[in-house]
Amino acid sequence: MVAAAATSAFFPVPAPGTSPKPGKSGNWPSSLSPTFKPKSIPNGGFQVKANASAHPKANGSAVNLKSGSLNTQEDTSSSPPPRAFLNQLPDWSMLLTAITTVFVAAEKQWTMLDRKSKRPDMLVDSVGLKSIVRDGLVSRHSFSIRSYEIGADRTASIETLMNHLQETTINHCKSLGLHNDGFGRTPGMCKNDLIWVLTKMQIMVNRYPTWGDTVEINTWFSQSGKIGMASDWLISDCNTGEILIRATSVWAMMNQKTRRFSRLPYEVRQELTPHFVDSPHVIEDNDQKLRKFDVKTGDSIRKGLTPRWNDLDVNQHVSNVKYIGWILESMPIEVLETQELCSLTVEYRRECGMDSVLESVTAVDPSENGGRSQYKHLLRLEDGTDIVKSRTEWRPKNAGTNGAISTSTAKTSNGNSVS
């Protein structure tokens, strides 16, 4: 079809059931009727005389050659199709260029359609994101993985991914109008000197993105108990729609002056509730606290960890992402070289500042989960005060799983179904 459209511009196609009409010169089309004019022969030139034994017919027409004139008589026999002269044919290079251009344009169009068909928002919506997006309760952002965000394995580090999760949460607060004076603080929170602190984080990694990949992150809020809220994230590959990472977190209110946890005041709850989604978390929470282990039984200990100025966040305490880096400091090097982190659960117990000196302890968990190795972690101050407890799961490298999120039915705070 594409080639026919291209060639029709050069060769007009007659309508069905019609045939070309002969011109005045017999079967020749009028556009191809030959016209001969006698030319004068200059002095000294050769004069050519027609051979009397010339063939009486040429191209199906009787030809009588006389001095200076050409007469044709219509041949009653069947005539072959008219022929076109070479100088009347189109420029073949132009024709080939036109055909090539059409094919290239068609190929690009099909490529674009094929990529659009793989976009995450056109795949099966297993958690009802489309409906939540229509309600304006989901924030969606895209990030490209930079060269300085990858590690020795040429994949994005867990710290990079957590920074992107935090960035989408802050942008989500801004889009909802909750960015009053500080990161995610509502007017009621500012009035009561309240700030958000992260108390628990869960991450499950199906596959780590690599340098140059573009990922899309969807995040939304939901209520969590009486003193906080939960935040969920889905990280997917922009090109294929594959879900790479799932994460969920719990945030609590803390008084900025007393540094103690606080319940949500009524006015703050009224500000937040319209933006909550009544939906199951993307990672099921078993509500079991991480068990404490004896530091003396630890398999690996890293001491003398001290925060730097750049490790502090806007609330003047160490960023929650920095704790993850400290936890991994005590992992055995042979594990880091042969395995990759696929599951992470972190409980934040206390904050620490510039003057803190910490130690990171790691112990092997004897229990197994599908052949994956498990470890328990403890980050504490030198005086023995617990700062962070964690549990991690590791799998052999290049053994990523295609985790799927079960279909769930959710409702927004105004009662709309999002399944």
Curated annotation (Swiss-Prot):
Transit peptide: 1-50
Assigned keywords, A-Z: Chloroplast, Fatty acid biosynthesis, Fatty acid metabolism, Hydrolase, Lipid biosynthesis, Lipid metabolism, Plastid, Transit peptide
UniProt cross-references to Gene3D superfamilies, sorted A to Z: Hotdog Thioesterase (3.10.129.10)
Reactions performed catalytically: octanoyl-[ACP] + H2O = octanoate + holo-[ACP] + H(+); decanoyl-[ACP] + H2O = decanoate + holo-[ACP] + H(+)
Catalytic residues (positions): N315, H317, C352
GO MF terms held by the record: acyl carrier activity; fatty acyl-[ACP] hydrolase activity
E.C. numbers: 3.1.2.-
Main EC class the enzyme belongs to: hydrolase
Subcellular location: Plastid, Chloroplast
Origin: domain of life: Eukaryota
UniProt cross-references to InterPro entries, sorted A to Z: Acyl-ACP-thioesterase_N (IPR021113), Acyl-ACP_TE_C (IPR049427), Acyl-ACP_thioesterase_NHD (IPR002864), FATA/B (IPR045023), HotDog_dom_sf (IPR029069)
Main location: plastid
Positions with biased composition (Polar residues): 61-78, 399-419
A GO term from the CC aspect: chloroplast
Region (Disordered): 1-84, 390-419
Known role: Plays an essential role in chain termination during de novo fatty acid synthesis. Possesses thioesterase activity for short chain acyl-ACPs. Substrate preference is 8:0 > 10:0.
Family classification: Belongs to the acyl-ACP thioesterase family.
Protein name (Swiss-Prot/TrEMBL): Acyl-[acyl-carrier-protein] hydrolase FATB1, chloroplastic
